[in-house]
């Protein structure tokens, strides 16, 4: 969950080149960096390690999907400001323009001692340095009554793709004057302002086509990122439409029922016509399998993004954790 800048990857490429120069000479082959995860972090890392090393490093990107849909800008799609296709990207340019080796398979596990990534096909790829950018996994069990099955009725849409399309269809299809319930996640999680940006886009849709609709936010927190700005904006642009209820006020979500679309709290039982539940989160599973996590997240050395648990592994993006990342949820 640490912001990434190009200079970080330039430094990583330079550091990796230096660190691997001796082994590569000994074995008569280029040093190899394997990147797991083809999202924004992983794809950017693969690009600039390949580009800035000027061919001195063999770069392989392991990503199961052949097309990546961004979570950022998904709210613009939700609000009808962008077409769905515009947030999708392929990996053609990485391979053709920068010589990155693309492996479209699942990375199942990492053998740290042997420095190998084990793939879903049963094969493995060796590495000298490993970059993991696994994104997040959702802790469905963190909300009583929510589950992987319930996401088809109450989409989290916290991983882009079909979930975001489902959420948009439900928002647009909600009955006139109905109630939309949003349950944001507890800290820490991917993109602290994200749930409230999403509420804003949903309110934008309702203002156009369903102006008597209501939005209820049942928050597991007592404050949220950029709260003052959001509250001011909601009052200005969507007066009377959005109600934010803190954990202190509703007393906690005791249970949800995806069949009846009900949310039971100490304050009341809320009935939704459409809903989005975003559960608690943790680093993507491959980071756990690589043993670079401490609990739900992966501690890193902020200056280099090197995993604290393994000097040969770097962890990027939402899966990584540092003091700076924790502070981001408070501002």
Per-region residue spans from a language model:
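Glycine-rich dinucleotide-binding loop and its adjacent helix/turn
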Residues: 134-209
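AMP-binding/adenylate-forming core of the ANL superfamily
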Residues: 130, 275-276, 314
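N-terminal secretory signal peptides and thylakoid transit peptides that target proteins
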Residues: 1-20
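Conserved small/polar residues in nucleotide/adenosyl-binding loops
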Residues: 324-331
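A Rossmann-like FAD-binding core segment of flavoenzymes
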Residues: 97, 101-109, 114-117, 125, ...
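Beta1-alpha1 glycine-rich phosphate/pyrophosphate-binding loop at the start
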Residues: 27-101, 186-227
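Short FAD-binding loop at a beta-strand-to-alpha-helix junction that anchors the flavin cofactor
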Residues: 307-323
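Glycine-rich beta-alpha-beta "Rossmann" dinucleotide-binding loop(s) and their flanking helix/strand
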Residues: 136-160, 267-303
């Amino acid at each position: 969950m640490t912001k990434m800048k190009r200079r970080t990857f330039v430094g990583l490429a330079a550091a990796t080149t230096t660190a691997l120069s001796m082994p590569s000479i000994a074995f008569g082959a280029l040093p190899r960096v394997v990147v797991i995860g083809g999202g924004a972090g992983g794809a950017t890392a693969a690009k600039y390690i390949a580009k800035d090393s000027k061919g001195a490093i063999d770069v392989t990107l392991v990503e199961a999907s052949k097309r990546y849909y961004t979570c950022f800008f998904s709210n613009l799609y939700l609000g009808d400001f962008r077409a769905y296709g515009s947030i999708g990207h392929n990996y053609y340019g990485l391979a053709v323009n920068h010589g990155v080796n693309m492996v479209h398979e699942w990375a199942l596990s990492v053998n740290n001692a042997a420095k190998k990534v084990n793939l879903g096909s049963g094969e493995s790829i060796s590495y000298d340095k490993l970059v993991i950018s696994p994104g997040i996994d959702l802790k469905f069990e963190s909300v009583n009554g929510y589950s992987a099955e319930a996401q088809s009725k109450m989409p989290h849409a916290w991983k882009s793709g079909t979930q975001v399309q489902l959420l948009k269809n439900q928002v647009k299809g909600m009955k006139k004057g109905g109630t939309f319930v949003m349950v944001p996640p507890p800290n820490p999680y991917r993109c602290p302002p994200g749930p409230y940006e999403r509420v804003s886009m949903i309110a934008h849709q309702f203002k156009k086509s369903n102006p008597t609709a209501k939005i209820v936010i049942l928050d597991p927190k007592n404050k949220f990122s950029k709260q003052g700005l959001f509250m001011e904006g909601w009052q200005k642009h969507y007066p009377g439409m959005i109600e934010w209820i803190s954990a202190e006020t509703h007393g906690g979500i005791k249970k949800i029922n995806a069949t009846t679309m009900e949310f039971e709290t100490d304050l009341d039982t809320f009935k939704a016509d459409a809903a989005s539940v975003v559960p608690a989160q943790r680093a993507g599973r491959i980071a756990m399998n690589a043993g670079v996590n401490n609990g739900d997240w992966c501690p890193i050395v902020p200056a280099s993004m090197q995993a604290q648990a393994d000097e040969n592994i770097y962890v990027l993006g939402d899966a990584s954790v540092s003091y700076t990342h924790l502070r981001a949820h408070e501002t």
